[in-house]
Structure formats: structure tokens, C-alpha cells
């Protein structure tokens, strides 16, 4: 996980719900202070430390601004690492995944730009619902299994959203 805690680095309390604008503002403030260019005339040791601090800051920011990564990080803070590869016993969601993938393939085959936009909005709604569900249960040890399941769903939707963006770019060409 690295030290210090990603949240402490940004002077935030560990929480799933974050003000992303506040996070970005704080990131820019901190990044200015450790940017390697500011240490161009410093000793080699100071340059290396600045580079390490900058890398740590970037990693923390990338983790906290991305809901699935933030969810995984919070779960790791609360009870140890979450296995990356596990057998998912979630037949309803597996079925939903298959339906979404088939629909995305159809949209690609048909080059349906308007359909992709509708699909993207539905994904965003599903992501928002997952985020709210996770926010409500991540800090409850009795709901750890549910929180992990939601985090895995969030990861899938994040990946699917990336694939939708790639499809949009191909259709725009």
C-alpha cells in the first residue's frame, strides 16, 4: 500500500465518497512542491527524493480519483489485500456482463454511434449505483464480502467503459 496512506497524503479522511475537484486541486498544489524540475540544481540525493515523492503522489492520486481503485485501496486498508484473481460466484452479474458484451459487439457491428451514446449513459448509471452501494457498506466488517463483490463489479464496468471509449474513437474516425 505504501506509506503514508494515500488519504493522509492529501489530508483527507479515508472515505469512498470524495470531492474529486478538491482532490485534483490538492494534487496540483502538492505536485508543484515536489516536481523534479524544481530540484534541477539540488544534490543528486534531493533530486532522487523529489522524484520518489512525485511518483508516490502520482500513484496516490491515480488510485483515489478512480472509484474501483479507491474501493480496492479502502478494502485493503480495512482488512488486508483483496485477491485480484478469484472465481466469481455472482451468476446474475455474469449474465449481465454477457448481455452488455453482446450489446457492445452489436453496436460495433452496426457502427451505431447513437446507440453507443445510450449504452454509455446506461453504464454510467450502473456505475453510479455501484458506487453508492459500495459507499454504504465498505466500512462494515459484516458486509466485507458484499463490498468485495461490488468492487469487482466496479472494476468490470470501468474496463467496459474504457472499451466503449475506444469504440467511440473508432466510430469517430
UniProtKB/Swiss-Prot annotation:
<comment type="similarity">
    <text>Belongs to the HscB family.</text>
</comment>
<comment type="function">
    <text>Co-chaperone involved in the maturation of iron-sulfur cluster-containing proteins. Seems to help targeting proteins to be folded toward HscA.</text>
</comment>
<dbReference type="InterPro" id="IPR004640">
    <property type="entry name" value="HscB"/>
</dbReference>
<feature type="domain" description="J">
    <location>
        <begin position="5"/>
        <end position="77"/>
    </location>
</feature>
<dbReference type="Pfam" id="PF07743">
    <property type="entry name" value="HSCB_C"/>
</dbReference>
<dbReference type="GO" id="GO:0006457">
    <property type="term" value="P:protein folding"/>
</dbReference>
<keyword id="KW-0143">Chaperone</keyword>
<dbReference type="InterPro" id="IPR036869">
    <property type="entry name" value="J_dom_sf"/>
</dbReference>
<dbReference type="GO" id="GO:0044571">
    <property type="term" value="P:[2Fe-2S] cluster assembly"/>
</dbReference>
<dbReference type="GO" id="GO:0051259">
    <property type="term" value="P:protein complex oligomerization"/>
</dbReference>
<dbReference type="GO" id="GO:0001671">
    <property type="term" value="F:ATPase activator activity"/>
</dbReference>
<dbReference type="GO" id="GO:0051087">
    <property type="term" value="F:protein-folding chaperone binding"/>
</dbReference>
<dbReference type="GO" id="GO:1990230">
    <property type="term" value="C:iron-sulfur cluster transfer complex"/>
</dbReference>
<dbReference type="InterPro" id="IPR001623">
    <property type="entry name" value="DnaJ_domain"/>
</dbReference>
<comment type="subunit">
    <text>Interacts with HscA and stimulates its ATPase activity.</text>
</comment>
<dbReference type="InterPro" id="IPR036386">
    <property type="entry name" value="HscB_C_sf"/>
</dbReference>
<protein>
    <recommendedName>
        <fullName>Co-chaperone protein HscB homolog</fullName>
    </recommendedName>
</protein>
<dbReference type="Pfam" id="PF00226">
    <property type="entry name" value="DnaJ"/>
</dbReference>
<dbReference type="InterPro" id="IPR009073">
    <property type="entry name" value="HscB_oligo_C"/>
</dbReference>
Amino acid at each position: 500500500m505504501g506509506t503514508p496512506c494515500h488519504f493522509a497524503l492529501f489530508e483527507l479522511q479515508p472515505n469512498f465518497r470524495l470531492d474529486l475537484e478538491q482532490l485534483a486541486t490538492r494534487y496540483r498544489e502538492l505536485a508543484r512542491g515536489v516536481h523534479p524540475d524544481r530540484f534541477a540544481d539540488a544534490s543528486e540525493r534531493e533530486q532522487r527524493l523529489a522524484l520518489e515523492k512525485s511518483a508516490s503522489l502520482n500513484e496516490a492520486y491515480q488510485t483515489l480519483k478512480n472509484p474501483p481503485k479507491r474501493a480496492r485501496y479502502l478494502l485493503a486498508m480495512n482488512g488486508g489485500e483483496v485477491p485480484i484473481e478469484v472465481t466469481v460466484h455472482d451468476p446474475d452479474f455474469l449474465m449481465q456482463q454477457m448481455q452488455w458484451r453482446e450489446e457492445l459487439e452489436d453496436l460495433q457491428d452496426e457502427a451505431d454511434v447513437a446507440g453507443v451514446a445510450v449504452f454509455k449513459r446506461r453504464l454510467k448509471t450502473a456505475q453510479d449505483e455501484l458506487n453508492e452501494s459500495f459507499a454504504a457498506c465498505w466500512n462494515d466488517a459484516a458486509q466485507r464480502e458484499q463490498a468485495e463483490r461490488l468492487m469487482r463489479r466496479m472494476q468490470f464496468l470501468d474496463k467496459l467503459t474504457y472499451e466503449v471509449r475506444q469504440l467511440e474513437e473508432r466510430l469517430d474516425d
